[in-house]
Amino acid sequence: MRGGKKGQQTAQKNRINEEITAQEVRLIDIDGEQAGIQSLKDAQTMADAAGVDLVEISPNAEPPVCRIMDYGKFIFEKSKELKEQKKKQKQIQIKEIKFRPGTDEGDYQVKLRNLRKFLEAGDKAKITIRFRGREMAHQEIGIELLNRIKGDLEELAVVESFPNRVEGRQMVMMMAPVAKK
């Protein structure tokens, strides 16, 4: 199924002009002033005289509320408002960085730089330490590594969860960015 322009499909369709079925309507004129209850014909004539549309704003009211306005401009303003609201919402993602107990200093610094980038962008970070083979016997190395990461990032992030034991063959620590003031 093919759709039209993105964003216009979800907008609630208001009935305009001839689509309105009520005999009487509560009218709001082009200046936003109450014009009282009018017959649909009179309201339509007033809208035509002004060169704009008669738009049903509240169809469930008794009688329905209609407004004289430029419908195209109304839709444009509504979609602009929705776009602004979407822009203000930030989707928080969880970024994962994997370490090993034997992660070398150079690799550690690169991974730490990436973690800083994620946290500064406002994303949460998941630090995973994976153990292989005999490394399982030295879980304290994993704890030391997590504590080192925690210390290096303490000005940027707070620890949400710190592992107190190994889950399977890995340890997982979650960090969230510190709220900016």
UniProtKB/Swiss-Prot annotation:
Keywords: Cytoplasm, Initiation factor, Protein biosynthesis. Belongs to the IF-3 family. HAMAP family: IF_3. Pfam families: IF3_C, IF3_N. GO terms for biological process: ribosome disassembly. Its main location: cytoplasm. Monomer. It comes from Pseudoalteromonas translucida (strain TAC 125). The gene is infC. IF-3 binds to the 30S ribosomal subunit and shifts the equilibrium between 70S ribosomes and their 50S and 30S subunits in favor of the free subunits, thus enhancing the availability of 30S subunits on which protein synthesis initiation begins. GO terms for cellular component: cytosol; membrane. GO terms for molecular function: ribosome binding; translation initiation factor activity. The keyword Cytoplasm applies. PANTHER family: TRANSLATION INITIATION FACTOR IF-3, TRANSLATION INITIATION FACTOR IF-3, MITOCHONDRIAL. This is Translation initiation factor IF-3.
